[in-house]
Amino acid sequence: MGVEKQVIRPGNGPKPAPGQTVTVHCTGFGKDGDLSQKFWSTKDEGQKPFSFQIGKGAVIKGWDEGVIGMQIGEVARLRCSSDYAYGAGGFPAWGIQPNSVLDFEIEVLSVQ
């Protein structure tokens, strides 16, 4: 499957290019194999927007490939197969089981 993108709200700004830094709000779903269960959000108390460099492998493959086509202001849900998320190891600290499909709701805040 890779990554599937569903636009929730279109953006109106530029799209990031490989090597640029994007700042996003993100909420991840798929705790304990249940895509309705949140495991993490930058909107939770004590959290802040997350920044990463596109195409450098600093984040899961689903983010690198899914966010590159998004515009500033866009909100989209990315469904990532396990090989585009945390794979066979999962992410036990967040309750992500091995080989889990995950959903991420991402809002692009800025591109630099």
Swiss-Prot record:
One of its GO terms (molecular function) is peptidyl-prolyl cis-trans isomerase activity. It comes from the Eukaryota. Pfam families: FKBP_C. The keyword Isomerase applies. Its EC number is 5.2.1.8. Its main location: cytoplasm. Residues 1-26 are annotated as: Disordered. Residues 19-112 form the PPIase FKBP-type domain. Keywords: Cytoplasm, Disulfide bond, Isomerase, Rotamase. It catalyses: [protein]-peptidylproline (omega=180) = [protein]-peptidylproline (omega=0). PANTHER family: FK506-BINDING PROTEIN 59-RELATED, PEPTIDYL-PROLYL CIS-TRANS ISOMERASE. Belongs to the FKBP-type PPIase family. PPIases accelerate the folding of proteins. It catalyzes the cis-trans isomerization of proline imidic peptide bonds in oligopeptides. Mediates rapamycin inactivation of TOR protein kinase activity. This is Peptidyl-prolyl cis-trans isomerase FKBP12. It comes from Arabidopsis thaliana (Mouse-ear cress). The gene is FKBP12.
